Curated annotation (Swiss-Prot):
<dbReference type="GO" id="GO:0003735">
    <property type="term" value="F:structural constituent of ribosome"/>
</dbReference>
<dbReference type="InterPro" id="IPR009000">
    <property type="entry name" value="Transl_B-barrel_sf"/>
</dbReference>
<comment type="similarity">
    <text>Belongs to the universal ribosomal protein uL3 family.</text>
</comment>
<dbReference type="Pfam" id="PF00297">
    <property type="entry name" value="Ribosomal_L3"/>
</dbReference>
<protein>
    <recommendedName>
        <fullName>Large ribosomal subunit protein uL3</fullName>
    </recommendedName>
</protein>
<keyword id="KW-0699">rRNA-binding</keyword>
<dbReference type="GO" id="GO:0006412">
    <property type="term" value="P:translation"/>
</dbReference>
<comment type="subunit">
    <text>Part of the 50S ribosomal subunit. Forms a cluster with proteins L14 and L19.</text>
</comment>
<dbReference type="GO" id="GO:0019843">
    <property type="term" value="F:rRNA binding"/>
</dbReference>
<comment type="function">
    <text>One of the primary rRNA binding proteins, it binds directly near the 3'-end of the 23S rRNA, where it nucleates assembly of the 50S subunit.</text>
</comment>
<keyword id="KW-0694">RNA-binding</keyword>
<keyword id="KW-0689">Ribosomal protein</keyword>
<dbReference type="GO" id="GO:0022625">
    <property type="term" value="C:cytosolic large ribosomal subunit"/>
</dbReference>
<keyword id="KW-0687">Ribonucleoprotein</keyword>
<dbReference type="InterPro" id="IPR019927">
    <property type="entry name" value="Ribosomal_uL3_bac/org-type"/>
</dbReference>
<dbReference type="InterPro" id="IPR019926">
    <property type="entry name" value="Ribosomal_uL3_CS"/>
</dbReference>
<dbReference type="InterPro" id="IPR000597">
    <property type="entry name" value="Ribosomal_uL3"/>
</dbReference>
Length: 236
């Protein structure tokens, strides 16, 4: 398995030569540096610890500073592990275009937007109650929780009952997305479809678990004029 980390920039769209529109999520992936290496002999599993998003010393505590000083690497805001990556040593810089290729199918993991304490209608898509008799607010209540029905049913609310509660802020993996293209001039990658989470949130890109060898073909329309500075466009 191969993996790398970045931050979500936002969504846009690109077009293929046949006119097909592809919605893509732009992920900024600066080079990740190997800060620590785990081995099966010493730690029981193979993995690399990657640092990304450089930060100042003032934003880190003493144990973190000591960890980076021992590895003789830059200071990073985030440290994350990727299991199954072997053959790397401390200090190596990993680039997304070197780990993956255009069209490769990948799995993307991110944390969804937190929505706080939410009612059952928004959280579980429950049906709203009838509004025909001016009942006030109870039309948004969740209704019966089916406790104490007698017989074989226990006299309590069953575990896992869909009710109001905390919604969002969950780690979600979206499988079988594909890399549409790379933008090395801005250290970014275009991934097909939507990725959970807010802009500037962490994103983990790994080899697809179900389709590790699948590579798709994209023939994108490249607007060369748009990629030039504004002054050069005006002269043309």
């Amino acid at each position: 398995m191969k993996g790398i980390f970045g931050t979500k920039v936002g969504m846009t769209q690109v077009f293929e030569e046949n006119g097909r529109l592809i919605p893509v999520t732009l992920v900024r992936v600066e080079p990740n540096q190997v800060v620590s290496v785990k081995t099966k002999e010493k730690d029981g599993y193979d993995a690399v610890q990657l640092g990304f998003n450089q930060t100042d010393e003032k934003n880190l505590n003493k144990p973190q500073l000591g960890h980076f000083k021992k590895a003789n690497t830059n200071n990073y805001k985030y440290l994350e592990e990727v299991r199954g990556m072997v053959g790397y040593k401390i200090g190596d810089l990993l680039k997304v275009e070197e780990l993956f290729q255009e069209g490769q199918v990948v799995d993307v993991q991110a944390r969804t937007k937190g929505r706080g304490f939410t009612g059952a209608i928004k959280r579980w898509n429950f049906k709203i109650g009838s509004k025909g008799h001016g009942a006030g607010y109870p039309h948004r209540f969740q209704g019966s929780v089916q406790a104490g029905r007698g017989g074989s049913q226990a006299q309590r609310v069953m575990k896992g009952k869909k009710m109001s509660g905390h919604y969002g802020n969950e780690l979600v993996t979206i499988q079988n997305l594909s890399i549409v293209g790379f933008l090395p001039e801005v250290s970014s990658v275009m991934i097909s479809g939507a990725i959970p989470g807010a802009n500037n949130s962490k994103v983990r890109i790994t080899t697809s678990k179900k389709n590790p060898n699948t590579v798709l073909t994209y023939k994108l329309i490249i607007n060369k004029k748009a990629s030039k500075p504004a002054g050069e466009q005006a002269q043309e």
